[in-house]
Amino acid sequence: PPEGVDRFTDTELQASDASGESLNSRINQHRTNDIARENSSLLPAHELLTKYRYNSLNQLVWQKTPDGGITRFAYDELGRIIASQNANQVAANQFSYTTYDALGRIVEAGALTPTVGISIREKTGTLVYTATGNVVSTRVEDQYPQNISRDRVEVTRTRYNDLSIGAAEIFETVSDQSTYRSTTRNRVAGIYYYDQYSSTTLERQYDHAIFYHYDIHGNVKELVQHDKQMALTLDDPTSGMKRTQYEYDLISGNVHRVTYQKGKADQFIHQYRYDADNRIVGVSTSDNGRIWEEDARYAYFSHGPLARTVLGSRQVQGLDYAYTLQGWLKGVNGESLDPTADMGGDGSSTSDVAKDALGYSLSYYEGDYQSIGTTTGSSFVYSNSPGLESTKNLYNGNIKQMVTSLIDNNESMLSTQINHYEYDQLNRIKKMQGSQLTGMTVTPSYHSSYSYDKNGNLQQLHRATVNSQGSVVDMDALQYTYKTVTDPETGQQVRSNQLSHVDDAIAGSTFNDLSDQNPGNYSYDAIGQLIEDKQEGIRNIEWRVDGKVKKIHKSNGTEVSFYYDGLGNRIGKRVLPENKTTLY
């Protein structure tokens, strides 16, 4: 215990007084009776409660949230999480699990349905057999989780040190297996993902894999991704592999070149240049390594921040950046798109860079920026005009005002837009008023207002826009209604953060926006994940155990399935019945 804390011994806790009651019993009675004697009229009517329970090692073993229900957690003897079960999984008798190797590194994670009765003991956070109460062994030598389940789903396996597959078969930068082994020692060699996994599944039967080859310094030298959906033939086990090779400055660690699919038809190369402070100053690309296109070059202020970006080898755009004294972004290019007012002079008769296509400024408080250059007044002419500037000064980093200038597809100047923002005491935006500027003449345009409940959920949203006749008209007057749900402990109906439906008081809108919804438009599963949107024709949404969308079923019969790699990145989408597949 901490210094100054003297714990009761078991003998002291079990010692009885004259009435025969132990000290431990009297402590428990006091706790119970003291709560009963509390004056409930002095207590607030708490709603949307989130509750936590911990074991004696201060590990979270149980939690209950307003939308996510009850989740239980189990740990091994070393305090590592080995299993969990949320409200969705309880109904399906499913558990999420994690396994470790002898060095404590995660080697497998996924979900399982046990073949024997198991449960998580809430008070201790241990995984036990339901019939006997004995603790489930999670040691490597006891073959956890095979000892409780034959089949698992959505499994990610991580392999260290070496691969069971020949490295020379996978990597183009490996010629000697022993050299490969020496650079991957104690490093991740491969990450495998399996939709289905059983005790008979071979390592090579993965759905997706990521392989790593390192240089002697531990930098990734080659990264190979193998998506079997991309395989052109089943006869070649390497078909579908995509390889990316990296070249580094071995002193600074900077990436000098990235080559995708070297020597293949889809080869593409990025090359990077740096200054003496290791800041990137140029990016070039090529599909053959001989003819290069400059994508961008960068310049910096003496104190570090990015000062200018020039895009393309033809210098199609220049982006100039200005910052406040606090380091907050003040503006990009300027507000008027006038070459004489641009910080970089782009588009002027003496410049090789095309005229700016966009510019904007951000204002925080009056006098938040003063330039050391000569174009300050003209670069931010609208922000500095007393008749245009918002008087709602903010000193916490929130933006009080934004000025935006753009050109259209025909390179004609659009009206400059100035937006004023207001916030509540919790820094939530509550109002936006937009105006169009013609010279210094202000014409009100877009505006919106927001209100929230005490839990931060939107209650009302009002929006107005400019119609085709140039008049400002109401577009939305939205009212958000939230569901009541059944408390899993008490069985009573309680409030939640789950949106039930959105009412729009503006009838007959011609803006192709959100239409008025009926009560109960949205439905959710036991852990608060959206599973139905009636108005959008979404009949059901299936979710993976890691919280990513697995499949969407629509009322018209369309099914959209999504696929992921072992790191959780989306790698594919399939649409049925059209049977159209997109791979990433």
Spans of model-derived segments:
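Beta-strand elements of repeat-based all-beta scaffolds
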Residues: 1-534, 539-542, 548-553, 559-575, ...
